Amino acid sequence: FNKIKKNIPEPFAIDNKRLAISKKELFYLEPINLIMIFYISHFTNIEIHPKTLRYITDCTKLIKKSLINNKQVNSIFYDLLTSSDDPSKTLRLMNEANVLGRFIPEFQKVVGLIQYDMYHYYTVDEHTIFTIANVHLVKNGFFKNVSSFATEAILKIKSFKPLMVAMFLHDIAKGQHGDHSANGAQIAKKICPRLRLNSDDTELISWLVLNHLLLSKTAFRYDLTDKKIIDKCADVIQSKERL
């Protein structure tokens, strides 16, 4: 990525220390750049020029089925979403520019969606992005004084990238009829292959989405001194990695 930083690829350029594009028509020629610009911005830590952001917002209608199913674009988005450096700032910017919901149409349904429950202080889209940010805060030891166990545990996770995809998808079925966890698990099975994930990772992500409320429901609704409750929970989880 240092090479990217030194040699910003065309049609991008640096304008007043910010990533820019000279004409919005250039997005019409290569719509892939509507995703690529966020990728470059994230991995070079160069902010996108406000004028270019307006161009992007004006051009989101170019994000059509052909771009959504483009292998290269999906690889770019996957690398951004699962970056070892917290991508939440970039994802939030993509969301504000209406790029995120256009590229992941299933996500568009939760943009601005309000939930009246104990888990959501924010709209579902913002809650999702905060969740991703918090995972990185845990990983980087921000909460170590509060819970050193969480920091130690997350550093042992082998499937960190699938975890980040699951974080992005965990509430994607909110606002739909039925159980949002079960519906979300089915949506995950459709989105994951699009992001070039293999069958094992797809199954893991779908399982995480399906069971993302298991621990909180068990902790808040059942007697944790009852061995049967703990055994039942353990039977669902099956492994330390999934836990």
Residue ranges of model-derived segments:
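Divalent metal-dependent catalytic cores for phosphoryl transfer on phosphate-bearing substrates
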Residues: 114, 123-124, 150-243
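Non-catalytic interface/linker regions that flank or bridge core catalytic/transmembrane domains
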Residues: 1-120, 189
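Phosphate-handling DNA/RNA-contact segment within nucleic-acid enzymes
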Residues: 134
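Intrinsically disordered or highly flexible coil/loop and linker segments, enriched in small
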Residues: 43-51, 62-65, 83-90, 99-104, ...
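A short linear-motif detector with a strong N-terminal bias
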Residues: 109-110, 142-146, 186, 225
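Conserved alpha/beta core surface patches that mediate binding of polyanionic ligands
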Residues: 2-5, 143-153
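Short beta-strand-centered segments that line the small-molecule binding cleft or hinge
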Residues: 127
